[in-house]
């Protein structure tokens, strides 16, 4: 753990000294930064297709099984004459 801490401290010291050296090595006069032209992009609005609500409601309330159930025909039961 101590070795890791020592490496971190050494790296920080090395970076700070490198930054200090680079800062002092630059000439006193600095050139003005070049102008950058900024272009703005205009995005067109996309019109979404309107969805009919009626169609969705009709789907919800639609009966399942499109055909009516077939009626079963059975012979009427006759009671024997008493």
Curated annotation (Swiss-Prot):
Q: Pro-region residues? A: 22-56
What family classification does the UniProt entry report for this protein?
Answer: Belongs to the Asr family.
Matches recorded under HAMAP family = Asr (MF_00546)
- Record field: compositional bias (Low complexity): 22-40, 67-82
Q: What is this protein called?
A: Acid shock protein
| Keywords for this protein | Periplasm, Signal
Location in the cell:
Periplasm
Question: Which residues does UniProt assign to the signal peptide?
Answer: 1-21
Instruction: Name the job this protein performs.
Output: Required for growth and/or survival at acidic conditions.
GO cellular component entries: periplasmic space
PTM annotation: Proteolytic processing gives rise to the active protein.
Q: Which domain of life is it from?
A: Bacteria
Cite the residue spans of the region called Disordered. Answer: 22-82
* Basic residues composition-biased segments: 57-66
Record Pfam families: Asr
